[in-house]
Swiss-Prot record:
Protein name: ATP-dependent Clp protease adapter protein ClpS
GO biological process: protein catabolic process; proteolysis
Family assignment from sequence similarity: Belongs to the ClpS family.
Assembly information from the UniProt record: Binds to the N-terminal domain of the chaperone ClpA.
Length: 106
């Protein structure tokens, strides 16, 4: 019997959808930017509180912010990165510091 129903073959469509579904999400770098007013201790506190760094790593990153102007705190999916940026910026404002946290595509 011949294949008269070839037009019903949706296998190629399913494979395309599976490939789309398996693509990893876009990732974003969360960055702390230096300013002349935020105390170093506060930057360390932020790195420990919001990014779960131990004191040694938080201190290293704080020094990168201080001497290089910025430091990458981590790379996350868009939703996680946006949430971390919002929380850090809100926490800085609540504590009356101009510390700025931003994100950029990784």
């Amino acid at each position: 019997m011949g294949k008269n129903n070839d037009w019903l073959n949706f296998e190629h469509l399913v494979k395309d959808k599976q490939i789309e579904a398996l693509q990893p999400p876009s990732m974003y770098k969360v960055i702390l930017n230096n300013d002349d007013y935020t105390p170093m201790e506060f930057v360390i506190d932020v790195l420990q509180k919001f990014f779960s760094y131990d004191i040694e790593r938080a201190t290293q990153l704080m020094l990168n912010v201080h001497y290089q102007g910025k430091a990458i705190c981590g790379v996350f999916t868009a939703e996680v990165a946006e949430t971390k940026v919002a929380h850090v910026n809100q926490y800085a404002r609540e504590n009356e510091h101009p510390l700025l946290c931003t994100l950029e595509k990784a």
